[in-house]
């Protein structure tokens, strides 16, 4: 109710930071799980040179336990990456969850509703502990090299957010791909024990 809205406050948190092959990666900290999963996967790739599907699959499997209970299966997630002429950079991910079902006046803005998201809160609206923030796997991320911004990235895609970012970073940093190549390259994703692999160049259609 209104009392809950009045009692809400924005928390500014210190990002997680990790070096990886000459790059410095900043991502979101707990209680969100996405950043932790990404850095855990990159740690497993830190001794690798160029990586392929097998190495990335192993990294995803190592990261997965951190987020198995925190994956969101709904859409309505938007990501923005912004940089200005002074090299100020921002990476912003927002999500509506299942939506609150009401708009704010005539703004067209709908508040989010993560308590209605069954993967995050399987026991229903009123089961979540009071005054405790619900976690998420969204993971806005910044990449720097020699103190200069290289990349701002994040993703929509609910449970595929973390794997998409890991694949992009592995292609960019480990494989030396351009940013365009790193983003558009085929990706791996592991969910519920199933490995999903986008087709590589030259693969034909497989029936059955």
Residues covered by each model-derived region:
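Proteins synthesized as precursors that undergo proteolytic processing into mature forms
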Residues: 31-69, 75-208
């Amino acid at each position: 109710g209104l009392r809950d809205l009045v009692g809400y406050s924005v928390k500014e948190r210190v990002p997680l930071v990790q070096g990886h092959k000459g790059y410095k990666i900043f991502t979101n900290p707990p209680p969100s799980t996405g950043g932790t999963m990404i850095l855990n996967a990159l740690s497993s790739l830190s001794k690798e040179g160029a990586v392929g599907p097998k190495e990335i699959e192993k990294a995803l499997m190592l990261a997965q336990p951190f987020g198995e209970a925190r994956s969101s299966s709904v859409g309505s997630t938007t990501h923005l990456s912004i940089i200005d002429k002074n090299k100020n950079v921002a990476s912003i991910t927002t999500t509506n969850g299942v939506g609150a079902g009401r708009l704010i006046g005539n703004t067209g803005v709908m508040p989010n509703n993560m308590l209605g998201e069954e993967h995050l809160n399987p026991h229903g609206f009123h089961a979540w502990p009071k005054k405790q923030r619900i976690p998420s796997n969204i993971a806005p991320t910044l990449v720097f090299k020699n103190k200069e911004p290289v990349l701002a990235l994040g993703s929509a895609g609910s449970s595929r957010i973390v794997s998409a970012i890991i694949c992009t970073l592995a292609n960019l940093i480990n494989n030396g791909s351009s940013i365009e190549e790193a983003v558009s390259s085929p990706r791996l994703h592991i969910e519920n024990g199933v490995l999903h692999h986008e087709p590589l160049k030259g693969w034909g259609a497989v029936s059955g």
